Amino acid sequence: MDYNKLRNIGISAHIDSGKTTLTERILFYCNKIHAIHEVKGKDGVGATMDSMELERERGITIASAATHVEWKDFPINIIDTPGHVDFTIEVERSLRVLDGAILVLDSVAGVQSQSITVDRQLKRYSVPRLAFVNKCDKTGANPYNVRDQLRSKLDLNSVLMQIPIGLEDKHIGVIDLVLMKAYYFEGKDGTEIIEKEIPSDLLGEAKKKREIMLDALADFNDELMELHMEGKDVPIEIICNAIRTGTLALKLCPVFMGSAYKNKGVQLLLDAVTRFLPSPHDIKNTALDINNNEKEIDLKIDNDLPTVALAFKLEDGQYGQLTYVRIYQGTLRKGQELINSRTSKKFKVGRLIRMHANNTEDIEFGGSGDIVALFGIECASGDTFCDPSINYSMTSMFIPDPVISLSVKPKDKKSADNMAKALGRFTKEDPTFKTYVDIESNETIIQGMGELHLEVYIERMKREFKAEVETGMPQVAYRETITGKAEFNYTHKKQSGGAGQFGRVAGFMEPLNKEGETYEFVNLIKGGVIPTEYIPSCDKGFQKAMEKGTLIGFPIVDIKITINDGQYHIVDSSDIAFQLAAIGAFREAYEKAKPTILEPIMKVTLEGPTEFQGNMFGLLNQRRGIITGSLEDGSFSKVEAEVPLSEMFGFSTVLRSSTQGKAEFSMEFLKYGKVPNAIFDELRKKFNDQNKS
């Protein structure tokens, strides 16, 4: 394989923008599948990339399956990413290992809420992208409008590389502004590409749009700028070099168009992927040297250097755990010995495979920059595998905290065993899915990023693991905090024969207003009134006290604790005595520091026909929502709001019924906010009643 020609790309989009259909067409044109299937299982088969039964049924892509294809002797690894906000970790994971991306947009809806989330993630990982305006055959299609939205909403320097030949039901092809040729897609499944001269009625428009394109590209190539200013013809090679330079520098987003469903424009998009998106050689990747104070190391695409690979996705295959890996340096070979830098455990590479959706191909070797999969390796998602001569870790992926929890109860003993297996598997493969046993109720609690996220795991428990479970009502992850300052001076004393316990801790607590931090401990002890070895014990005790607040039993956050005095006993003082003194001191001051309850506030985006805009406003207002913005774009309306998570349960059903199923919403965690007094009283009462019973 020529690794200079390798492309690792992702296809990212808002849900229902036609992303899986586009991937399906790419597989078809690259001869990986022999028939085209539609997504929602209309023909009883379902799209090839949506290989989980559940995905085929819902018509949404959940797991990012990796597929290897070849287009005109360019090897391409495609990671199919989910478009639903509840599966954000899948998207984050995929982007971590990509070199380039295709952002798919609906020609009518344009830039939607999830497109904005996906774009933000692409920017976080500095992923160069092309835009593909899909569904140009739809009523109301307007690729020019979408190009403008890419500028106004995503702040991308979006430049048209093509213009459509006809729109809506008259969409028959595209004009390539670089080559100045018209392309039509004919024959069964659009496999015959017909190149013709540009139709005379579109020539003027094409010339005008080409001028705009060349003006934009002049920023990326001096030779192009000079030729263009002098009114001379610019060679195609120079134009292509300028497009590639701008795209790789993240300063240009080339815009292509067509209709994946109607088989228009997909092959030209593949040409653009090979021409304008980066190879692994074009991207800088770094790792941290664990043996050298986590010093940053530049990794090189070189098969002769020690191996560094990242496990970015786990799946249950028919032969055991399947681990998807991206090789950043060196090679992976069958029988090779590697070390997991997180666990320091050595292991041997067994079966090495290349994936095609859910079919596998055994291979002997994977080179630098490639994406392959391993069977039977014990690891967690995000682990780094290295040659034993080095100890590197790829920087960890950004992992958001879960915002919703649910109790799950197995119906019988067999289901209990299967549920335990399922939970072990899910927590390994998804760092945003967490589980624990509530000590008081003895219930198993699962936590995740949203209702759909947890629903999918409940379904998977039933289908894949045959675990019949009952679920409780979704619970919100509340927090407690303080709004005032309070002093403490607490003595912990226990003398009942034998070794006693003694420790006194004094100081004060106050709100901590620091972005991204929830606790700070300041030691102002002088003169050894608390010996140095017991200071960490105090710190530990305060943190223990914060695990469960006294208002409603949720963790306490945003507190700064300062200790400035204390006392110890030469015999009775100990680590545990000062931990208990700190816990007592915390509780004493907490009641006086005006404690309050915080709730997760979500950023909610509603999109739907303008005729339902009033209904959308109404639904948000009923849920204590604060409208932060609204946009009317002809027949299409978008409303943004900040809404407490506790008000959003079951919202999708209510939204569907009040908009005839025509509106959709997405939400993501924004911040924690103080609950209103009425809700504060309600939560306190509920907590106290539970404790009494």
Curated annotation (Swiss-Prot):
PROSITE patterns referenced in this protein's UniProt entry, alphabetically: G_TR_1, G_TR_2
Record keyword Nucleotide-binding present: yes
Positions with a binding annotation for GTP: 13-20, 80-84, 134-137
CDD domains, sorted: EF-G (cd01886), EFG_III (cd16262), EFG_mtEFG1_IV (cd01434), mtEFG1_II_like (cd04091)
UniProt main location, coarse: cytoplasm
One annotated GO molecular function: translation elongation factor activity
InterPro entries per record: EFG_II, EFG_III, EFG_III/V, EFG_IV, EFG_V-like, EFTu-like_2, G_TR_CS, P-loop_NTPase
Record-linked SUPFAM superfamilies: EF-G C-terminal domain-like (SSF54980), P-loop containing nucleoside triphosphate hydrolases (SSF52540), Ribosomal protein S5 domain 2-like (SSF54211), Translation proteins (SSF50447)
GO cellular component: cytoplasm
Compartments reported by the entry: Cytoplasm
Intrachain S-S bonds: none
Pfam families found in the cross-reference section: EFG_C, EFG_III, EFG_IV, GTP_EFTU, GTP_EFTU_D2
Domain tr-type G positions: 4-281
Signal peptide: none
SMART domains attached to this UniProt entry: EFG_C, EFG_IV
Record keywords: Cytoplasm, Elongation factor, GTP-binding, Nucleotide-binding, Protein biosynthesis
Family affiliation: Belongs to the TRAFAC class translation factor GTPase superfamily. Classic translation factor GTPase family. EF-G/EF-2 subfamily.
Known role: Catalyzes the GTP-dependent ribosomal translocation step during translation elongation. During this step, the ribosome changes from the pre-translocational (PRE) to the post-translocational (POST) state as the newly formed A-site-bound peptidyl-tRNA and P-site-bound deacylated tRNA move to the P and E sites, respectively. Catalyzes the coordinated movement of the two tRNA molecules, the mRNA and conformational changes in the ribosome.
The protein, known as: Elongation factor G 1
